């Protein structure tokens, strides 16, 4: 097994958090609640979706380090809009959302820094049946999707 150092990934996440937290906190209410992307999501809903992504990644990273069984996780990608609606991100407190997003991603850094290197080849199967290793998950974290 090759040795892995994920410092470039964790440093990148930290840089995104530092830059984006400042930007997000300065956005006016009308921008975060009315401006929509091509999926018809507001900025509040997009940030909520990023929190959901972090929570799903967190669950996978931790479970892959101890599970002895093959793991199958639900297909979160098909349920994004449902997750956003059920959690009512549109009406959530903006400052709380920013802090939750920040803290969850800081915790992801902690999880990555503490990962059991002997478990990097542990894998789960996505909804298509494709195998995804812990190493691939970490290396595949997109800084534009933090």
Model-derived features: positions:
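Acidic interhelical loop/turn segments
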Residues: 24-39, 74-88, 109-139
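Generic serine detector
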Residues: 4, 25, 53-55, 67, ...
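Structural signal for well-ordered, non-membrane alpha-helices
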Residues: 14-25, 55-62, 102-116
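Amphipathic alpha-helix face/heptad-repeat signature
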Residues: 9-16, 50, 97-104, 137, ...
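Conserved small/polar residues in nucleotide/adenosyl-binding loops
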Residues: 144-146
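Short, helix-capping/interhelical loops that line the mouth of catalytic, cofactor-
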Residues: 1-9, 33, 56-101
């Amino acid at each position: 097994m090759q040795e892995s150092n994920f410092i470039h990934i964790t440093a990148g996440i930290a840089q995104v958090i530092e830059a984006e937290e400042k930007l997000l906190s300065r956005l006016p209410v009308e921008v975060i609640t009315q401006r929509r992307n091509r999926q018809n999501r507001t900025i509040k809903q997009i940030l909520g979706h990023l929190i959901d992504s972090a929570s799903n990644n967190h669950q996978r990273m931790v479970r892959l380090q101890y599970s002895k069984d093959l793991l199958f996780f639900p297909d979160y990608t098909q349920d994004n809009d449902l997750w956003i609606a059920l959690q009512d991100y549109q009406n959530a407190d903006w400052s709380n959302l920013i802090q939750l997003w920040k803290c969850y991603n800081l915790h992801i850094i902690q999880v990555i820094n503490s990962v059991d290197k002997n478990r990097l080849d542990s894998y789960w199967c996505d909804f298509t049946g494709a195998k995804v290793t812990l190493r691939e998950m970490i290396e595949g974290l997109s800084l534009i999707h933090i």
